[in-house]
Amino acid sequence: MDSSIISRRAFYRSIRNEDFTKTKFSQIVPDREGLYLKKKVFLGYTDISAAGSRALLGISVKTISCDLDIPELGTSELICHPSTVTMDIPLLPIQIMHLNDAIIFKFSLIVINTSLPPSKCHLVADKIVNLCSESEIERLVVLTTIKLRIPEKKLAPLYENTFNTRALTTSPSLPDDTKVHDAFLNVLIQMVQLQGIPCNMMIAPGHGAFSSVPTVDDNSLQAIRAFHQFIGGWTRLKFDEKVCLSLEFGRSKKIRRAGTLFMFS
């Protein structure tokens, strides 16, 4: 057997056994054989405000980052960049971060920090859902922001819709007839249901992100804090808010998502 294959297997076996005693604060592992997810997975992506991805990039424990390369996407540019702080976590267009901590080692974070063309969203969703299935995860938690047609005074700070699992919070769920104008989320929801992946959708009200750091005006600041409050209440994960709030959304135009409308039913 090829010795390189043996070494790769040994490397990933050491990751599964949480053998991180000599690991730096953050380390990049190339995308190659052996990609996997731990039992509980958080996913944040570039939706209308990129609040979920910015919330996760502030993780304040040691991580190992894996480049989730999808050749069909071609060259991908980063959407969010740190504006005022130096980050220990490397920024990649699509990455998996395994938490390197003896107490919270069962978590992986997936961050999509690039804009996905509507015609390519199914490629990314398929890769992620297949990884979830192959890794036999216990739960996928998706952090997303949606522009909701609900009067401002009646908006909740966070909603939760579940698929194939129980709720994690007492937050209200969005009605079954809620329309979602988000190509990636549409495809992800369908694939999650098709493959029976236990999934919790944590949804914060949102608007198109400004070309700036998170602000109250586009609701990205409130969404990031709502996500952190939820995660902190369910897990022992901690985040550096200064890092999250320094991540500048790098597009001059608001993101628009094409795609079929999908209901939460």
Where do the protein language model's features map onto the residues?
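Generic recognition of well-structured, leucine-rich alpha-helical segments
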Residues: 135-138, 195, 234
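N-terminal catalytic or cofactor-binding beta/alpha core of small enzyme domains
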Residues: 1-139, 145-147, 155, 252-256, ...
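Short secondary-structure junctions
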Residues: 60-72, 172-176, 237-241
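Conserved, well-structured core segments that form the ligand-binding/active-site neighborhood
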Residues: 9-26, 191, 195-196, 219-227, ...
